Amino acid sequence: MAPLDLTRGQTDACSTENKDILCRNVLIYGHCRYEDQGCTYNHDQNKNSSQPEAPSKKMFNVDSPSFTPSGQSTVLPKKTTLSSQAASAAPFTPRGGGTPTLQTTAESTMFNPAAIREFTPQNYDLGNNNANGISQENGLYPDPFTMSTMGTALPTAGQYNLPLYGDHSGLAAPGAPFYPPHAAYPTGPIQPPHYHLYQPFGPYRQELQPWQRATYDFFMPQNLREDLQKKQFATLQVIPNSGLPQLEHWHSLVPLDTSNRKNTSCFGYPSWVYKAQNSRNGRHYALRRLEGYRLTNEKAILNVMKDWKKIKNASIVTIHEVFTTREFGDSSLIFAYDFHPLSKTLQEHHFQPIHGNRYRPPPAVPENTIWGYICQIANALKTIHSNRLAARCLEPSKIILTDINRIRLSACAILDVVQFGMNSRSVVELQQEDFVKFGKLILSLATGTLPAHLNNIPAALETLGNKYSANLKSAVNWLLDTSSGETKTIEHFMTGIASQMTTFFDLALQDNDEKLFHLAREVENGRIARSLMKLLTILERGDYDGVPSWSETGDRYQLKLFRDYVFHRVDADGKPNLSIGHMLTCMSKLEAGVDENILLTSRDNETVFVLSYRELRQMYDRAFNELVKASKTGAPGANT
């Protein structure tokens, strides 16, 4: 920038008046190149500072008070510092000795950040109809988040009066300390609840200190999630080109046996287990096949299924269908049961030897686990015996473990069909045999010996007494005792183990509370997906109601900017910001309609909006309701 030429147009009359005025070139550049060429202004800074400053009556002074209209009664005092209005004043150029006049420019006033009041959050006022300073909209779209409408629904002040999440200053007035003392709860007006946070409920608690947090305080427990995912994968598992046939409406057969050896000790026929899908309902079932069985009496299936379909018990695998087929190249009998993925038999879980440096037997089963098995099998036998039936198959290879210490009888009704009309024993005799098999099963679990290898039961009972309590030994001895000649009942047995039944029942209730706790936290995990679907039906929509740019105008344009704010963010280097937490937080706040302001900017940075989530929620509802009204039948779940 060239220095100002202050010598042009000067007169002698003006020279005398300008000699006491400090040259502006000296102030700006430190010197004046026209000092020796006739510049009439003062060039000595020391001289200017030593002389008293006389206010100029003719020249413009930056220290003069700002202009005040004549109608204003109060006169502002003169400021001693440089006024902010001087920044927008016209450049100083001396033109003569006359009285200068201020010239107005057509340029707009510069943006002054100091003139904007700083936003200070105030306390909520439930009695105020417009607590947020935003005009309420009447008509078809009432505001569900108005504090006046929530005041009647919320409890009175002092009840549940907890500070808002993330508000460390509680409910105090502006200027309160950032971390106030927590001696008592605040007594001001209550805050609205967090509808965008889904708080789990239930009495489930873990032994943690108040300042401690576990991972599943924020997510589903990792082991539970992995277990559910593995079971889902196992349910959907298929084997291409397996060579297994399709059985009428059963398809996609997958073998579940871990051994390919044929075993006829339990049913008298080799049996195999498959997973199959039912084409009628799409569900998966477990099919148990008896190889080489030839049905001689059709009433066997009808009568047995009529009796066993009535059995509904949590410790028994439900049977659904029995049929014969020749698709395997022979005459086979098929039983369809409920499918429990990743389940193992008690024989696979407890009787498999451990192979290491030396061959050693499996470890002993804890007594609490054995008592849990006893309570569940007793529960199953009570239901079976109450319906004048017998379990008949209490083998470790036919009882499955579906979860931790959770067992089910999986081969019921098979012997009733296979031996239909051939068995001369009564139901009471078969029920008494169930008690003996029950006792051998528990004794084999306690001693680590399969029931078929229990040749010396008294010696096994002595071994049991050395490792476990006297109550367990007494219960097993009662089940195995056949010398008394009395008719045993499952009710009598359950009376003797009432203490253990109560303990197991309490553990089951605690487990149910824990599952309910995690379920309550996941009950609304699909709400963000539904909100996103509704948002996408509004954005980028083509011609609507004769308006080609409907989605680019009005409220829809601001929703489009909100979409960019949530999903198209970049960091300081211009790289995509893929923070899932940011996306979930923004969509949750939009769903809740909170009063938090955000800055929305267009992609060309020409348009800027400062909007709250509550205003965006109103725009979001109006736009979607407009689409719903225009549709013929409406949108299913539009009001969810």
UniProtKB/Swiss-Prot annotation:
SMART domains: S_TKc
Residues engaged in binding ATP: N263, R288, D338, F339, H340, P341, L342, S343, K344, T345, S397, K398
Keyword Metal-binding: yes
Residues covered by region (Knob domain): 538-640
Coiled-coil ranges per UniProt: 499-537
Keywords of the record: ATP-binding, Coiled coil, Cytoplasm, Metal-binding, mRNA processing, Nucleotide-binding, Zinc, Zinc-finger
Residue numbers spanned by region Disordered: 43-101
CC terms in the record's Gene Ontology section: P-body; PAN complex
Location (main, coarse): cytoplasm
GO biological process, one term: mRNA processing
Start-end of C3H1-type zinc fingers: 17-46
Sample GO molecular function, one term: ATP binding
Polar residues composition bias: residue spans: 43-53, 63-87
Subcellular location: Cytoplasm
Region (Pseudokinase domain): 237-498
Pfam families reported for this sequence: Pan3_PK (PF18101)
Family the entry assigns: Belongs to the protein kinase superfamily. PAN3 family.
UniProt remark on domains: The N-terminal zinc finger binds to poly(A) RNA.
Function per UniProt: Regulatory subunit of the poly(A)-nuclease (PAN) deadenylation complex, one of two cytoplasmic mRNA deadenylases involved in mRNA turnover. PAN specifically shortens poly(A) tails of RNA and the activity is stimulated by poly(A)-binding protein PAB1. PAN deadenylation is followed by rapid degradation of the shortened mRNA tails by the CCR4-NOT complex. Deadenylated mRNAs are then degraded by two alternative mechanisms, namely exosome-mediated 3'-5' exonucleolytic degradation, or deadenylation-dependent mRNA decaping and subsequent 5'-3' exonucleolytic degradation by XRN1.
Record's subunit section: Homodimer. Forms a heterotrimer with a catalytic subunit PAN2 to form the poly(A)-nuclease (PAN) deadenylation complex. Interacts (via PAM-2 motif) with poly(A)-binding protein PAB1 (via PABC domain), conferring substrate specificity of the enzyme complex.
UniProt protein name: PAN2-PAN3 deadenylation complex subunit PAN3
